[in-house]
């Protein structure tokens, strides 16, 4: 299949493989007039033994696909909530390879829900592009977003991903310069991740009118789905953004429930996960009300 992210543009790399799970999921959602709910969680948080179960619970409570953060010691784009989640995961001994093993375990029971890895380039470079992408394919990863890899410098990495039928996802923000914006729209696959706020994850102020304007402008330039993250915390913001975007990405509002708990306290972990699932139910209901 050939895929043309930019309207009327030619693909940089010829893609003859079937649709990815991400592409298939968005096609299904579009046919059902539904919006994608994409939770973000940090691999190994609150502890490695609970993480795979957390992924399955997210699906049961309405996740259409899941972004899994790769723990890193210097997460420049992460706000305090997500950064602390990474610290907890690292303290528990979770490495990039461990994260991939968790995805592989998830895949033993779930072969449908797309998994997108979100992280930073340094751990990937240590493993090596080819080895990393091979491990991702073996584990059942569907897409990768490297926060600090500009599209103009992603050629080799992009080729590896394309050869293995995985989507490479990039960020667009209110401050993205025109040249960078064009590069993102040219190279991106799966979906556009639009950062709704100026700042790091978990920032507080969300201007839904501005987001709506920006999303509409992006949609005029690409056929890719546009999903919005940063600042979505509740049903009100989910519904306001979901009315214009193809999906919403929610991280800090979920991950914050693992803050300040004892990761070895089974009851505390279970209680935190119940709060996360209650939030998922709230967000799912809000999005589904848009197509009711």
Can you describe what each PLM-predicted range is?
Residues 19, 214-222, 233-239, 243-292:
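Alpha/beta catalytic cores of nucleotide-metabolism and tRNA/nucleoside-modifying enzymes
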Residues 45-48, 66-96, 196-203, 258-259:
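Glycine-rich, proline-tolerant flexible connector loops at the mouths of alpha/beta enzymes
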Residues 20-24, 28, 74-82, 94-103, ...:
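Active-site-adjacent beta->alpha loops and helix N-cap segments on the catalytic face
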Residues 66-73, 143-145, 150, 194-202, ...:
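Glycine-rich phosphate-binding active-site loops on the catalytic face of alpha/beta enzymes
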Residues 37-41, 66-68, 115-119, 144-146, ...:
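Hydrophobic faces of well-ordered beta-strands that scaffold small-molecule active sites
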Residues 17-38, 103-108, 291:
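N-terminal amphipathic alpha-helix/helix-capping segment at the start of soluble metabolic enzymes
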Residues 49-56, 176-185, 232-248:
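Catalytic cores of alpha/beta
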Residues 81-116, 159-169, 173, 211-226, ...:
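Alpha-helix-loop-beta-strand connector modules within alpha/beta enzyme cores
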């Amino acid at each position: 299949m050939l895929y043309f992210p930019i309207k009327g543009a030619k693909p940089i790399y010829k893609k003859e493989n079937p649709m990815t799970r991400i592409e298939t999921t968005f096609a299904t959602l579009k046919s059902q007039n539904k919006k994608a709910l994409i939770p973000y969680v940090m691999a190994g948080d609150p502890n490695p033994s609970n993480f795979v179960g957390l992924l399955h619970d997210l699906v049961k409570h309405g996740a259409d696909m899941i972004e899994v953060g790769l723990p890193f010691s210097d997460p420049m784009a992460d706000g305090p909530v997500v950064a602390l989640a990474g610290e907890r995961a690292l303290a528990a001994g979770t490495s990039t390879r461990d994260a991939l093993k968790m995805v592989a375990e998830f895949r033993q029971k779930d072969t449908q829900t797309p998994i997108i890895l979100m992280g930073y380039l340094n751990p990937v470079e240590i493993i090596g592009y080819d080895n990393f992408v091979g491990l991702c394919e073996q584990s059942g990863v569907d897409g990768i977003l490297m926060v600090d890899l500009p599209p103009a410098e992603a050629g080799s990495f992009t080729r590896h991903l394309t050869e293995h039928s995985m989507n490479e996802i990039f960020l667009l923000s209110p401050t993205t310069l025109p040249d960078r914006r064009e590069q993102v729209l040219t190279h991106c696959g799966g979906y556009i991740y639009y950062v709704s706020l100026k700042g790091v994850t978990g920032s507080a102020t969300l201007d839904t009118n501005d987001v709506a304007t920006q999303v509409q402008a992006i949609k005029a330039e690409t056929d890719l789905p546009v999903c919005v993250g940063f600042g979505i915390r509740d049903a009100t913001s989910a519904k306001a953004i979901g009315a214009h975007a193809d999906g919403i990405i929610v991280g800090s509002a979920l991950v914050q429930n693992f803050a300040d708990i004892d990761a070895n306290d089974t009851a505390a972990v279970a209680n935190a996960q119940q709060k996360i699932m209650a939030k998922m139910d709230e967000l799912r209901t809000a999005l589904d009300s848009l197509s009711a």
